[in-house]
């Protein structure tokens, strides 16, 4: 270590040649050092001498490659402090590709490019009306044939101040054809767009280092996904330390959504987006409604459109502003005025999706600023000592669960074990086949005989179900490969989500029959449906607001209403007839008798004499008998028995009163029975001569009086 302190990283005679006219390439430091390898606790070291170069390699701003050539001609020997010329000078060539920023994408859902409101002028607008009435605004159905209630039309009355001004017609049109109205509906014809959430960004580029010594050529390629490499002859080793920050920050789009046009594909699979980057747009997240419940936002659905307040008095196309086509038209107008677009990618960014292995659903932009990469190159030489520990390792297992492409990201869990006897550092590279975004190499330290797990996030660039092959490469502290393992994982196809919109593409319903037999079938179906509806009355219940809406019921010929209205009109005469029949059967005779017994006073006066009349009759009868007995008996006998006769007379009067009451009671019963018989004879139409005679006498007395 003393030699390491004495040697102050001195290298001389460095000649640097520049190609492609790229400025700013710098050699940051140069040195010689002796690296000693320790493989066990025995203390034995395996040492070798290296020449170390620390370079700052820029990226080309034009998208081409920037190169440097460094030829080492002289080195300083520590033992003699003299400059010595290298007999065969090595030539180092470094090429760095253009840098790009690669962004993680997460599929959110699909949205329509231009939602449209349709209206139909009609006179029979109803929510469940067919295409013959509301035409394009007929309710839609899903793949299973179920009616989608949220797609039903909204009916608005006619008038000049309505959502769609229309004439109401004259009074004759209203009476014959019905009142005019308009049907409004939301539909999604035309293009659809994928919506992606934008996640973290990663910087991408590649550095190619070539070392030529005489006729021998060593070459390595490194980048953020593979930051260390060793040539096959172990003469050259390269380590990518990192990048120097620029003055301009790389844009972050975490508050934006990327919208990409959805192209047609076979068998319902999402199509490739191709290179139609002119339609790609970046829009703020606040402009979207992912649940479709907000008006005037991208992704608006049926519920938001149908439930907007004051629908019929709101302007036409309300709730459908700020859609994708509005932003696209705004960009086109700016481009026509020779201005930069505000939402589109073309014109704002360079080298869109030109990174290696670009998939149909990946997103990258070119970095226009020159970025410097810190690169360390090691060559064989003799210099200072540097001791490091090296230990073998092994990849035990790799596990990658199946996941949905684009919507989710995969996680590769790699289990590694230090199989040596010393603690050492390792690096792990995870390289996948085409179609998976690259992942950066990881560095870590493992204790002897210990096991650790390293995780990598995998982002496929395709939305179809596919299988991928990945290779995990374990490197030791000398960047030499110590183990390699392959694995496979699968992804399921991205499930496209249209939100609250109809899942199947919108098509205008067919209203015309396709042939003669189809016409017969449609006619027969209409007849059957009309007959069923005529009997059940579903149309009347849905279209007529009240029971007494006569014009509506007459217009739609409602059978149930006609039956109910006829029953209502026939209720009064039927009730009267029923009461008359019950009267004829004598059901109400007890009621009549009860009324006569309690409330018919004139009848009682005619049949029952008063108490005074009865007493007077008794006294008159007594006087008559007493006068008759006065002439037959002597005065003495009458005088002797006068007191006894009075007592007997009083007793006889009471008995006579009782017998008279019984008589009149029997007379009342006979009169009542006669009235009942008279009613029965009248019911059956029987008239007796005696009844006729009595009736004639009653009429004669009335005329005389």
UniProtKB/Swiss-Prot annotation:
Tissue-specific expression: Expressed only in mature pollen, in the two sperm cells.
Keyword Signal (UniProt): yes
Compartment annotation: Endoplasmic reticulum membrane; Cell membrane
Note: HAP2/GCS1 family members mediate membrane fusion between gametes in a broad range of eukaryotes, ranging from algae and higher plants to protozoans and cnidaria, suggesting they are derived from an ancestral gamete fusogen. They function similar to viral fusogens, by inserting part of their extracellular domain into the lipid bilayer of an adjoining cell.
Disulphide bridges, residue numbers: 36-47, 125-155, 137-185, 156-312, 158-168, 295-319, 432-470
Record's protein name: Protein HAPLESS 2
Membrane topology annotation: Single-pass membrane protein; Single-pass type I membrane protein
Record carries keyword Nucleotide-binding: no
Domain of life, per lineage: Eukaryota
Intervals, Cytoplasmic compartment: 583-705
A Pfam family annotated for this UniProt entry: HAP2-GCS1
Family note: Belongs to the HAP2/GCS1 family.
TM region positions: 562-582
Compositionally biased intervals (Basic and acidic residues): 690-705
Any one biological process term the GO annotation gives: pollen sperm cell differentiation
Disordered as annotated region, ranges: 617-646, 668-705
One example GO MF annotation: lipid binding
Effect of disrupting the coding gene: Defective in pollen tube guidance. Prevents gamete interaction and fertilization, resulting in male sterility.
Domain comment (free text): The N-terminal domain (62-541)and the C-terminal domain (583-705) are both required for functional gamete fusion. A positive charge, and not a conserved primary amino acid sequence, is required for a functional C-terminal domain. The N-terminal domain may be involved in interactions with another membrane-bound protein on female gametes, while positively charged C-terminus may function through electrostatic interactions with the sperm plasma membrane.
Annotated PANTHER family: GENERATIVE CELL SPECIFIC-1_HAP2 DOMAIN-CONTAINING PROTEIN, PROTEIN HAPLESS 2
Keywords: Cell membrane, Disulfide bond, Endoplasmic reticulum, Fertilization, Glycoprotein, Lipid-binding, Membrane, Signal, Transmembrane, Transmembrane helix
